[in-house]
Amino acid sequence: MAQCVRSTLNPVRTPQSFTRKAYVKSPAFASVSFLRAVPEFNKYPKPCSLVMSCQGKAQNQQEERPQLSLDDLVTSNRKGEVLGTIKDSLSNCLSETNLLATVPGLKSRIKGKVRDIYDAGDYLVLITTDRLSAFDRNLASIPFKGQVLNETSLWWFNNTQHITPNAIVSSPDRNVVIAKKCSVFPIEFVVRGYVTGSTDTSLWTVYNKGVRNYCGNELSDGLVKNQKLPANILTPTTKAADHDVPISPNEIVEGGFMTQAEFDEASMKALSLFEFGQGVAKKHGLILVDTKYEFGRSSDGSILLIDEIHTPDSSRYWLAGSYEERFQKGLEPENVDKEFLRLWFKENCNPYEDEVLPAAPAELVTELAWRYIFLYETITGSRIDIIPTQEPIHDRISRNTSQALSSLRQL
């Protein structure tokens, strides 16, 4: 299996289709395990311990850290520790939710590709499921994927509060966050540090066609695929039907999507978040290549970070140690993502046209679950609690969400 996985680690990657959610704010967290007073989230280190510019011991530790390699992914002892739990959980994934039937006070549900959003009056409840989405459809359910995505975002939300306030009120369950409602800007702030990608709207695709002004960014001649840009750039998109449409800052303002002041503030936040994320990723042997952010305005007028941040579903990560050598040789960067499973579906069916798709092999589902865990633990420097349970995840989520909402309504 290791050899099979290793041979498919780095196919040409198609950037994710970034999905928009309508949700909200908050400057503070509860415990990941259950809603405690609301403002405490002590699981993770302070932001300054993660910033590349921190001096002294943290910087020395960074310099001494061995380079991350594919061997760490394929032969890690940690992989052996979690594989059994992953396999035991293949039949207990969170594929669908129906909290309208199990949690009092919920009014409606919006089902997204991965997240289900419930209206709870003053709050929204966001459930991150284990669904794997690609080719504009769900391909499989991956054990612990929802938990890993949720806790990855929580970790980043917690450690970027010095840059921007965010949408989270509490996290009463490993798959759940509760947020206050706000008015969501219909723009996705895509930030890129490299010329890469293969979809119609990716930077390399449009650049290779001769485009030298993309979303208001002037691009010089002579760039090659996967090259690092002289500076990070913002390439916003807006939603039209089911696809992203690139848009320039002038078009955003002239089209009434945002005011100039709103766009300027959100842009500054997005670029600052990306720079911070690159520093954290570099510290842990990774390159944060590109990502997307979404923002909304709260009832008090503040611009808040919403949705998710720097997850493996919304971001592209490469291995830093081998990047330069592979770039010089014209090879694709080594990466850690879901592309190998996408490739399996493309080789075994037509995922765009076939009405019924084959079931993903259990060994590939297990491998992808491990990759999500690996990326979380690599970025955060801490182990995620992967707890096997016989209790259906939906029952646990319903119980914890009900208790959390009841506590919030009493505040």
Swiss-Prot record:
What residues does the transit peptide encompass?
1-53
Name the EC number(s).
Answer: 6.3.2.6
Instruction: Tell me the pathway.
Output: Purine metabolism; IMP biosynthesis via de novo pathway; 5-amino-1-(5-phospho-D-ribosyl)imidazole-4-carboxamide from 5-amino-1-(5-phospho-D-ribosyl)imidazole-4-carboxylate: step 1/2
The UniProt catalytic activity note for this protein reads: 5-amino-1-(5-phospho-D-ribosyl)imidazole-4-carboxylate + L-aspartate + ATP = (2S)-2-[5-amino-1-(5-phospho-beta-D-ribosyl)imidazole-4-carboxamido]succinate + ADP + phosphate + 2 H(+)
Q: Name one GO cellular component term.
A: chloroplast stroma
Q: Where in the cell is it found?
A: Plastid, Chloroplast
GO MF annotation: an example: ATP binding
Q: Which UniProt keywords are listed?
A: ATP-binding, Chloroplast, Ligase, Nucleotide-binding, Plastid, Purine biosynthesis, Transit peptide
Q: Which Pfam family is one of this chain's hits?
A: SAICAR_synt
User: Out of the domains of life, which is the source?
Assistant: Eukaryota
- Which GO terms of type biological process are on file? 'de novo' IMP biosynthetic process; response to auxin
Name the enzyme group at the top EC level: ligase
Q: Does the keyword Nucleotide-binding apply?
A: yes
Q: Does the keyword Secreted apply?
A: no
Q: Which InterPro entries match?
A: SAICAR_synt/ADE2_N, SAICAR_synthetase_CS
For this chain, the family text in UniProt reads: Belongs to the SAICAR synthetase family.
Tell me which HAMAP family the record gives: SAICAR_synth
Protein name per UniProt: Phosphoribosylaminoimidazole-succinocarboxamide synthase, chloroplastic
